[in-house]
């Protein structure tokens, strides 16, 4: 961790090249639910912690609790960036929490705070949409990647495959977020999108 912090500092060039200290939280229970954790803080602040990993807990709520404490103690910002949601086997955008409990306002508010953007494309494929959920979109099959979330669901019924695809891709969840805003007063899926190499 100290090497990551030192490298970020070494390559930082104010006004020319911005670096962030960060790491990957790699939860894998039931499907890949990976998040990049990015800190805005100084080396002193980020160096005061040991990153919270999926070895401590696979539940993102536990990660967010750890990061909330960090924010309160340091005064710095931190975000988590979901990525490879296409490989989540429907786990990333489930209709309940990791512990299979109903969503609460507090849960949705915390998720909104920590996840303002998601990665929708990278070399492991596209997380924007899927041909099963966007059959009329000629680009829905673009960059499916070497491993698709539905490879794990090949023996499932078409309805289950569609459900898993909807819970793994950004375009579907944007609609879900609008409905959640009506129900809960908060939209946890109002996010920007990024692409990575």
Regions found by a protein language model. Give the residues of each.
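Extended, charged catalytic domains and RNA/DNA-binding interfaces, predominantly
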Residues: 1-197
């Amino acid at each position: 961790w100290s090497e990551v912090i030192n490298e970020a500092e070494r390559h930082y060039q104010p006004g020319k090249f911005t670096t962030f200290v960060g790491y990957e939280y790699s939860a894998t229970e039931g499907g890949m639910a990976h998040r990049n954790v990015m800190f805005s803080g100084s080396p002193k602040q980020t160096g005061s912690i040991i990153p919270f990993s999926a070895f401590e807990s696979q539940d993102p709520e536990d990660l967010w609790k750890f990061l909330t404490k960090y924010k309160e103690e340091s005064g710095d910002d931190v975000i988590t960036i979901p990525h490879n949601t296409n490989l989540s086997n429907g786990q990333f955008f489930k209709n309940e929490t990791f512990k299979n409990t109903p969503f609460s306002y507090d849960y949705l508010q915390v998720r909104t705070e920590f996840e303002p953007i998601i990665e929708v494309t990278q070399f492991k494929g596209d997380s924007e949409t899927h041909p099963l959920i966007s059959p009329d979109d000629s680009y829905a099959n673009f960059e499916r990647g070497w491993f698709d979330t539905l490879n794990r669901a090949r023996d499932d019924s078409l309805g289950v495959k569609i459900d898993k695809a909807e819970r793994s891709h950004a375009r579907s969840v944007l609609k879900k977020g609008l409905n959640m805003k009506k129900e809960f007063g908060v939209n946890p899926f109002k996010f920007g999108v990024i692409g990575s190499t």
